[in-house]
Swiss-Prot record:
Belongs to the polysaccharide deacetylase family. Its EC number is 3.5.1.-. It comes from Rhizobium meliloti (strain 1021) (Ensifer meliloti). One of its GO terms (molecular function) is hydrolase activity, acting on carbon-nitrogen (but not peptide) bonds. InterPro entries: Glyco_hydro/deAcase_b/a-brl, NODB_dom, Nodulat_NodB, Polysacc_deacetylase_ArnD. Keywords: Cytoplasm, Hydrolase, Metal-binding, Nodulation, Plasmid. This is Chitooligosaccharide deacetylase. The keyword Lyase does not apply. Signal peptide: none annotated. The gene is nodB. Changing residue 10 to M: In strain: 41. The record marks 148 as: Raises pKa of active site His. PANTHER family: CHITIN DEACETYLASE 1-RELATED, GLYCOSYL TRANSFERASE-RELATED. One of its GO terms (biological process) is carbohydrate metabolic process.
Amino acid sequence: MKHLDYIHEVPSNCDYGTEDRSIYLTFDDGPNPHCTPEILDVLAEYGVPATFFVIGTYAKSQPELIRRIVAEGHEVANHTMTHPDLSTCGPHEVEREIVEASEAIIAACPQAAVRHIRAPYGVWSEEALTRSASAGLTAIHWSADPRDWSRPGANAIVDAVLDSVRPGAIVLLHDGCPPDESGALTGLRDQTLMALSRIVPALHERGFAIRPLPPHH
């Protein structure tokens, strides 16, 4: 039986490889009407792609943001329906969280191709990996985590990313909050936004290419 696992860096045998120093930007816990549009504006300013791991309940309540993400050339991926710790969920609940989130994304934007999933809190169980694979989703973790959700300051976020990235790195950032937190507050991700506007040009100056996550089979 094939052992299931998640991907925390993109290996050199994938579509882009690491010869061109590829980096992959990802955002969790959106879409959020106060944060996601500004994140998208910065990405558009620099012409770089990202993958948004969205929560299904937010996809249902903010379908226009799902459509905008896709229309602007980014990927929408699965971050479960309600953001539970999947390791505490039974098999049927795990399956429901995964399947309903993908359905919510497609309902919001039929053009969306849901190919990837990230477990809430980065907590993967064998059940979550198995159910994700059964749903045709590749499990994606991360290799660079500046813990921007803790609001350490824009400088700290920038430094943490630049200090930890290498070719193939998957960078974790946030454009929202889980449903059990106050995710609708204006300014919630202002530090992430400020940091992003510095991270992208700094990565380019270091010779990195920011690319969309390649498909995995």
